[in-house]
Regions:
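Local beta-strand/beta-hairpin segments that build beta-sheet-rich folds
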Residues: 46, 73-74
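Short hydrophobic/aromatic patches on the structural cores and recognition surfaces of FHA
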Residues: 43, 62, 80, 98, ...
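A short, compositionally biased micro-patch
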Residues: 51, 59, 69, 91, ...
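Cyclic-nucleotide recognition modules
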Residues: 76-129
Length: 158
């Protein structure tokens, strides 16, 4: 169990480190016009696992928890951070659920804006972003798999 928990903590750390790259990218979207802003109360679900990935979100204020489909916390994001990019960039439905931890104001970045920014980006940078997005999805799935296995093991010990 100890090594399983360490592995999950490691995957959560990797996920946070990869999000630093997306934090740097957020500056590209900060000055974008025509962004809708939406307010969420603490506990509100912003999007759920398997929802269509039509938008990317930028936290203007507040905190957002990212969790796996079975409720494993994958990270807490704060003001200035982007989320929802993975499914959008790799063109798959949402692989996680996003929940407002505190009352939050979220800027919604539409698909057209994202495509314009990505098309203007250096092709190498665009490839790096896509590769990191794939790795985040894989790391999240692996963390959840091990978390579920640990829960089964714990239930057998009782």
């Amino acid at each position: 169990i100890y090594y399983g928990l360490l592995f999950i903590q490691y995957l959560q750390f990797v996920n946070q480190e990869i999000s630093i790259v997306f934090h740097l990218i957020r500056s590209k979207f900060m000055g974008t016009n025509n962004q809708e802003t939406k307010t969420f109360r603490a506990g509100d679900i912003i999007y759920s696992h398997n929802d269509p990935a039509e938008f990317i979100f930028l936290i203007h204020s507040g905190k957002v928890r990212i969790e796996s489909k079975h409720g494993l916390e994958l990270g807490i994001l704060e003001t200035g951070e982007i989320f929802g990019e993975v499914g959008h960039i790799i063109e798959t439905p949402r692989t996680v659920t996003a929940v407002a931890v505190t009352n939050s104001i979220i800027r919604i970045i539409d698909e057209k804006t994202v495509k314009e920014k990505m098309n203007k980006a250096d092709p190498v940078l665009a490839a790096i972003v896509r590769g990191l997005s794939l790795r985040i999805g894989d790391a999240n799935a692996l963390a959840e798999k091990h978390w579920l296995e640990l829960n089964v093991y714990k239930s057998l010990k009782k």
